[in-house]
Design a protein with these regions (language model features):
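Short alpha-helical oligomerization interface
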Residues: 114-129
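Conserved glycine-rich cofactor-binding loop
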Residues: 27, 34-35
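N-terminal Rossmann-fold NAD(P) dinucleotide-binding loop
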Residues: 38-39
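The beta1-alpha1 cofactor-binding region of Rossmann-like NAD(H)/NADP(H)-dependent oxidoreductases
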Residues: 59, 80-93
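Flexible cofactor-recognition loop at the NAD(P)H-binding site
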Residues: 35, 104, 110-113
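Conserved glycine-rich Rossmann-like NAD(P)H-binding loop of the short-chain dehydrogenase/reductase
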Residues: 48-64
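Non-catalytic terminal and boundary segments that flank Rossmann-like NAD(P)-dependent oxidoreductase
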Residues: 1-29, 96
């Protein structure tokens, strides 16, 4: 078996990883795409030509981020949509509202361990619901769109 290697390291940026890749005509969703790693990922995808949907808990705050990305990348195809991956009803709505094919799904949103026990409305532990269950539901809910691409 041949070992797979890469020149990328822990210090590599999203822009370095995607350099030379043309994503024109591709659509991506990035959960938590308005901050942190999600922001850098969204910006790199847009710079490579992808249309990107920022799926975020706070759409009002994300709109300014989306505008920043539009201006800095020259890519106007950045939209913001409400999604709380810890809330399965929100995930179901997001999936039901999605139209068209989807080539890229970046399940980025996440939370760190909480000091106290917090549960979702459905009774799930918050970190499990956010970091695993919601993304599993999102991926399975968007499966048809991913396959259509």
């Amino acid at each position: 078996m041949e070992r797979i290697t890469t020149n990328f390291r822990s210090s590599s940026t999203a822009a370095e990883v995607i350099e030379g890749v043309d994503l024109s005509g591709k659509h991506a969703i990035v959960t938590g795409g308005a901050s942190g790693i999600g922001f850098k990922t969204t910006k790199a995808l847009c710079a490579a030509g992808a249309a990107v949907t920022l799926a975020v808990r706070r759409p009002a705050a994300a709109r300014a981020v989306a505008e920043n990305i539009r201006v800095s990348t020259g890519n106007a195809a950045v939209e913001v949509r409400s999604l709380d991956v810890s809330d399965l009803a929100s995930v179901r709505r997001f999936c039901a509202d999605w139209t068209g094919p989807l080539q890229i799904l970046i399940n980025n949103a996440g939370i760190m361990a909480l000091q106290d026990l917090h549960r979702t409305l459905e009774g799930w532990e918050m970190q499990f619901a956010t970091n695993f269950l919601g993304h599993f539901a999102l991926t399975t809910g968007l499966h048809a769109a991913l396959v259509a691409a």
